């Protein structure tokens, strides 16, 4: 017992030393603060691993997407941005606009710390279009005492489609934490919605000890806000709820999105939260009671760590908005870097936004489905296809005729019989990641693993596989389909640093895919862009984003394969692949 206690104390000291070395402090603990690095100027930008068709500023650090909105013919995206360096710090609201969600023009920054209610930071928030007033920003400001406050900003000229200049009125803040709340964990107001009782409502994330909390605030005039008596929802042991999102989905229309203020009987609500502790997100489907201002999850999936996710990979701080132009709900999300802090500084940039995705309720009514917006297909170039090609155990077939490091690949697999599927161990029911770590792409199975090998060298010294493995769930008598995106073999680079910031993060990511495979088919789409691989299983039922940094499998030296390591022969029923061109404009302008 004494030895055990000594070991525990030593481990605690190591953790504290590690935190101290990383300069993580106070309320900023949810971001790693490198005071000596956050203003280190960028002399040049290294393009070796830089994506070509994903949203990025020309240089420096980017994180949360903020305030996406469609207004007067333009898509607007604001985002957290470091004006001076490639690590987190000096954060402002940068601002870009687009006509097509593909080509982006950078404008002047919208918000930066300047007044007592945000002098310590202008953090994440949303935009609401208020009838008679135009767009209004709700955002989190940090005062000099490091207390988080909710503020608003208005456009100087609401008639300007570009919304170039914003004003922070002196009657801010509009919401402050009361004595029952944690003032250092009170942030990220959602887009507000107008209810039939005459009130506007917004949701703000928080925590009390280890309980994650979403508070609702109400207002009649969008200036004076009052906290509801009870949280709209909370959950023990989930920690701080960052970047909450709350929106309705239709139970009958599986093609169109709904605006926030839609009222109708055939709807469910979605509550998504970003978990500060894990840097993962999860969501539930449920019922929102307007009179009580309470949200009640259905209970069909876990409400907590093991819940459903928008994306099972490197994806965080996501934010949706309703696109009035095409009657759809669109999702943005941040994919951070996975290499070292030193590498980020040397290359002069860090972070990107994933390709925007449409959000719909699946026809099963049990989960959401996500798909890249159709506009991204305008970047498709050279095209190759493959049909009705069998892949036997141990085979891999190269996809030639495109640029594998910058591509869009869609493939439908036919597996036929599932008799050879391995028996599913029920202890992994809520542990897809652990199962993927054990059953990697090189571990032979019955039905699978099969899928794509992306960003690979010919000898597979480096590669990032995205694949399925089908199990037989004897409890449900249905197939259990595992989807993995495994970055462990993605790079030959060896990091020996003692601290996390000095080591490349090369994880596997995984999620189960809810398909019955009655017709023996399953689809996979991967968007490959140098250091990011976004993959969509079964038409978007399961999505995984990986960040990878090959040493050899870069640019024209990267290869793409289809593979099968299962004893069951798998057929490539159809494969369509395209080069992806660069957008004509990617944030050229004010930044």
Curated annotation (Swiss-Prot):
Gene: CWINV4
Keyword Cell inner membrane: no
Residues at which substrate binds: 61-64, 80, 88, 123-124, 187-188, 242, 276
Glycosylation sites: 145, 182, 336, 472, 565
Coiled coil residues, start to end: none
GO molecular function: sucrose alpha-glucosidase activity
Enzyme superclass (EC): hydrolase
CDD domains in UniProt: GH32_Fruct1-like
Protein name: Beta-fructofuranosidase, insoluble isoenzyme CWINV4
Source taxonomy: Eukaryota, Viridiplantae, Streptophyta, Embryophyta, Tracheophyta
One Pfam family linked to the record: Glyco_hydro_32C
Keywords assigned by UniProt, alphabetized: Apoplast, Cell wall, Disulfide bond, Glycoprotein, Glycosidase, Hydrolase, Secreted, Signal
PROSITE patterns: GLYCOSYL_HYDROL_F32 (PS00609)
GO cellular component: apoplast
Family in the record: Belongs to the glycosyl hydrolase 32 family.
